[in-house]
Design a protein with these regions (language model features):
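Cofactor-binding loop segments of dinucleotide-utilizing enzymes, especially the Rossmann-like FAD-
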Residues: 8-9, 65, 103-107
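Short, solvent-exposed loop/turn segments at secondary-structure junctions
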Residues: 39-43, 68-74, 109
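Nucleic-acid nuclease catalytic cores
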Residues: 96-112
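Conserved N-terminal substructure of TIR/SEFIR domains
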Residues: 1-60, 94, 175-179
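C-terminal interaction surface of TIR/SEFIR-family domains
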Residues: 111-178
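Conserved TIR/SEFIR loop-to-helix hotspot centered on a Trp-containing motif
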Residues: 66-93
Length: 179
């Protein structure tokens, strides 16, 4: 079973909880949001704890809710928390972009994310509570589709690798019988 880490700001917890509930319904996943049990250990730095989280999880889902505002080039912009963007970057670096999912809020004028992330496809949700369940369900469906496609590719690669080994064993056994 694959272990999924969900990262968000405190303000993003309602969306993270909805994602947790949706993904947790799939038996092939073990879903662990940052706020459920302490992922950050006593007497350790946050960075040390994050490195442990990277080791313990196969993929991450990060809610980049626009909780902060910053002035960028004389314009006020709404931004996700720096720590959530940092954690996303750590997961991308360790597990690859295909296993670190960005979840963004739809319809935020003047929103900003680091330019290096703008070319990476994110899934979006409707922030209104009355639409959240359906929106998050669609977000999770997109993530699960990507994982299913990745698994079938992994299965094919493993099958090809095994079939090559079986083929070699067959040739060697035929040679042994012939001698």
């Amino acid at each position: 079973r694959e272990r999924v880490f969900i990262g968000s700001s405190s303000e993003g917890i309602p969306v993270a909880e909805a994602i947790h509930k949706e993904l947790d319904a799939h038996s092939e996943l073990v879903v662990e949001p940052w706020y459920k049990k302490s992922k950050f250990k006593l007497s350790r730095s946050y960075l040390d704890s994050l490195m442990g989280i990277l080791d313990d999880h196969d993929l991450g889902v990060f809610v980049l809710s626009p909780d902060d505002s910053k002035t960028m080039r004389h314009k006020r912009m709404r931004t996700p928390r720096d720590n959530v963007v940092f954690e996303l970057g750590l997961f991308m670096g360790r597990h690859g972009c295909g296993r670190a999912f960005m979840v963004t809020q739809k319809g935020v004028p003047d929103s900003w994310i680091p330019s290096d992330l703008k070319g990476i496809h994110a899934v979006s949700y409707d922030p209104k509570p009355q639409h959240r369940a359906q929106a998050v369900s669609q977000v999770c469906e997109t993530i699960l589709e990507q994982l299913a496609g990745e698994r079938s590719y992994t299965w094919l690669t493993e099958w090809r690798s095994r079939s090559g080994v079986y083929h070699e064993q067959l040739i060697l056994s035929k040679r042994a019988v012939a001698n």
